[in-house]
Swiss-Prot record:
PANTHER family: GLUCOSE-6-PHOSPHATE EXCHANGER SLC37A2, MAJOR FACILITATOR SUPERFAMILY TRANSPORTER 16, ISOFORM B. Glycans are attached at N53, N62, N66. GO terms for biological process: glucose-6-phosphate transport; phosphate ion transmembrane transport. The lineage of its organism: Eukaryota, Metazoa, Chordata, Craniata, Vertebrata. Its main location: endoplasmic reticulum. GO terms for molecular function: glucose 6-phosphate:phosphate antiporter activity. It comes from the Eukaryota. It is found in: Endoplasmic reticulum membrane. This is Glucose-6-phosphate exchanger SLC37A2. GO terms for cellular component: endoplasmic reticulum membrane. InterPro entries: MFS, MFS_dom, MFS_trans_sf, SLC37A1_2, Sugar_P_transporter. The chain crosses the membrane at residues 21-40, 86-106, 116-136, 138-158, 187-207, 208-228, 302-322, 334-354, 362-382, 391-411, 434-454, 458-478. Belongs to the major facilitator superfamily. Organophosphate:Pi antiporter (OPA) (TC 2.A.1.4) family.
Amino acid sequence: MRSSLAPAIRLMQSVSRDSCYRGFIIVMTFLFYTCYHMSRKPISIVKGQLHRNCSALPSPPNISANDTTWCSWAPFENSNYKELLGSLDTAFLVSYAIGMFFSGIFGERLPLRYYLSGGMIICGIFTSFMGLGYYWNIHALWYYILFQILNGLAQTTGWPSVVTCMGNWFGKGKRGFIMGIWNSHTAVGNILGSLIAGAFVSTAWGLSFIVPGIIIAAFGIFCFFFLVEYPEDVGCTPPQQPEDTKENLEDMPVSYNSTDTICKSTESNEDDSGNAHTETEHPQAISFFGALRIPGVVEFSLCLLFAKLVSYTFLYWLPLYIANDAQFDPKAAGDLSTLFDVGGIIGGILAGGISDYTGKSAITCTIMLILTAPMLFIYNYLGQTGVSTTVAMLIVCGILVNGPYSLITTAVSADLGTHESLQGNAKALSTVTAIIDGSGSIGAALGPSLAGVLSSRGWNYVFYMLIAADICACLLLVRLVYKEIRTLCGGMRKSYTEM
């Protein structure tokens, strides 16, 4: 007697080929950008080891008992260590911000698979060189600043590439919720980076950089062999291409000018026999200033500048703040800081789901930003009063801080990059993503740098800066919120009239 088909095989047969490939792309791009964030996290964990209070440790025989910095790593052993550590953050984030504006342009003009895989391998090399400074006993500040700059430039290859790849494979339906789940790679990468770096920080902090560097380079090789840029390359159906959509695209007029092609419509040509045939040209890549003219790009870019300032200040300085304020060792502080990223996962999914349900991205971001300001104030005064309080406050702050940041960098960027004014030109996606994330990266560079200066005067000043930045982010969305409220009220009046 022959048995029925195995359940797993029946399940595989029930899943379409398109769904399999799309699931594969989601998992791949998730893992790739997880590696990017994992490789940039170790510096925040290692900070607590580069400068330590050595008075509580037994000193070697040749060290004076009055020397409280003998266990620190030069040149970070002096009282200006916060400024020096801040300069490492600034070097990385400024180069990242500058490089991001050009990365989207290159990403649209180079093969995506080569660009992404090459960037990941280079990131792995530069990250590892930071750790090799430990084994080569390098104490020159310029060495660490140099590789922070190079790594910052290499890291810009990641975000525009993975967002463009996702945009090539997925349409707009439930984009906020899907992107909210997918964007948890940021928090997952931060958590993995913290745990991996924390495992080595107290014994050999060089491995805190080298191990993540090897991992991202290995995934870069995997990317080269397996990434599929477009559904058409493997015979899958491209997103948003039902018959009615195709007909609508054929009816769209040409929309371009002499300096900036937004879209090229379908053209009809005649062959030698006189028969007309339709030929769809590939749309040209949009220019930088053309992308800025897309409605909403400027507002969300400036909003992200301040939102990312807050998020990245937590990313780079939270472990040190916990270690100094609550007297945890570097490993425990790094482990505890991952709770902020856990909250970030929840916040990204929550913001995406609310945005999908309401269709109001600006209102969703603004409400979460409004709630963030008082929560930061409360955390500053109550956050370290007990372990349970710290855990709760870190998760809540992670939800509110990273929710808007996640929504803007994923679903909002993808929506603006495929805005109706572009008339189907998907070439704008990488450039729009790079503009929005590049603007945010300016804030990401400013936040940790200012925190390095202000923290020497007291952590209160750092939190005042974060609250001010959060308020600025809210104000920059006022015009878009007003438009969304008018649309919402208009829809309610229409429904009331129809009743």
